[in-house]
């Protein structure tokens, strides 16, 4: 399929430029060009006609006074990078992320649509279609389940089909509801099969999966998985016909060990491997985007040529786009990067659609401006009452036990029922252990709250509130009910975001006014905002990899072992509510 349309006139002109019968629009002269098809560097001229490459070789093109000539001797030319697995709503949004990615050499992205699924389909489609005009080629995947444990009208058979059939949607997934597959959920299996019936790819989500489980996933239609933790996991996926994506994200910085482990296995690098930054939260993007991922791979011992191929040709082939993008060859869209050295993947110049669009990390062209006022992204606040400290007090059960969520790492939580001291009013007291806090999820629509003691998030944390959560429920964490209520009221005032209270004062405020989960602010501002929150939480003793992801995933029902939901604390393995939600007082 065409990634960008080409007119009959431009098509004929491209052929004429290739034959040296018409002048080139752009001539990149004398660069060392990476041939991703053979993994060799060649000193060639690259000749562009409009948006597309017309010629790659040793002969000089026909030029006129309109031809832009780039003297590139001593520089290295590679295709624009492709991010095959983006999550573009981690406080930032698809527009600001694309602008940022373009500055550092990413010219293609395949992105998650989960945060769009609460919108009417017409609005969802309008956003995806508007992004087609961005210099970064943007496609999406269609989610098959809401990842909340709650039914949602966007996830009926009819609505799944409508999303999957959209031309900007080129895969299904990622498949987070594996239990639904094993239980033969009719709607989920329809989505899996319909994705493959359409000839589209299907992304899995199988961390720690056995070879037997991966067999079932492949049989069900999964064609790739980004959840390999060890080199052997990569090999298992490839042996079963999947593509294996090597990940380096803020929550799973696995790439160095994957590379070293693969080298230790002594097997050749595979054309069925890709690289991803997998939706890192803003602070990690201080180091860049796909350029940073490639650099990590090279520093870990991956040959540069292999790293560039995994970030260009391989994802293009996987998604059936390699006749259009992913390589420097005639007929392809002219997305190319000039690098100062082979092992330095941050480009000095970015070319997209045949034009110089960024130089030294600065955008040179206007991109696409979102129309958020035309989308239903205002945070809903159906609460009819002011937050009260009593919402954040927990009584033990009749056996004197209280639910305790233990953070095993940044995203995995295990539930236990423990004896806890109580205060004079019979509420759980946390004064004996500074590492404890209370965590509450507020179901604003249903007027309910789910409460537990939280161990491992930090020390002496008075009050934090967040509308940024996987389920859309509001999360409040702290040791001081007054500060917790204050933080919750503040995020309602700013129409969404994350607020941290200490000694009665706001010490960190991160406004996320779009659906309470993201902002239209530019990436640099979002990165600084995220760094401030992380630094504040580190000062409060948070030791896990990524506290922003920790907050997001407290309500994500695709992760073990216990999660907070609108109906109570759920045991993920059994699907049973083990601690029911309570009404708001």
Please annotate each region the language model reported.
Residues 2-18, 22, 72, 98-201, ...:
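Divalent-metal coordination cores built from histidine and acidic residues
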Residues 1-44, 49, 54, 100-107, ...:
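Active-site microenvironment of metallo-dependent hydrolases
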Residues 80-82, 140, 275, 477:
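Residue-level marker for buried hydrophobic side chains located in beta-strands
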Residues 87, 114-116, 141-148, 174-178, ...:
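Active-site beta-loop-alpha junctions enriched in small/polar residues
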Residues 61-77:
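Active-site metal-binding motif and surrounding structural segment of the metallo-beta-lactamase
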Residues 75-97:
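Di-metal (Zn2+ and/or Mg2+/Mn2+) metal-binding site signature of metallo-dependent hydrolases
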Residues 155-173, 180-244, 253-275, 285-299, ...:
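Histidine/acidic residue-rich metal-binding segments in metalloenzymes
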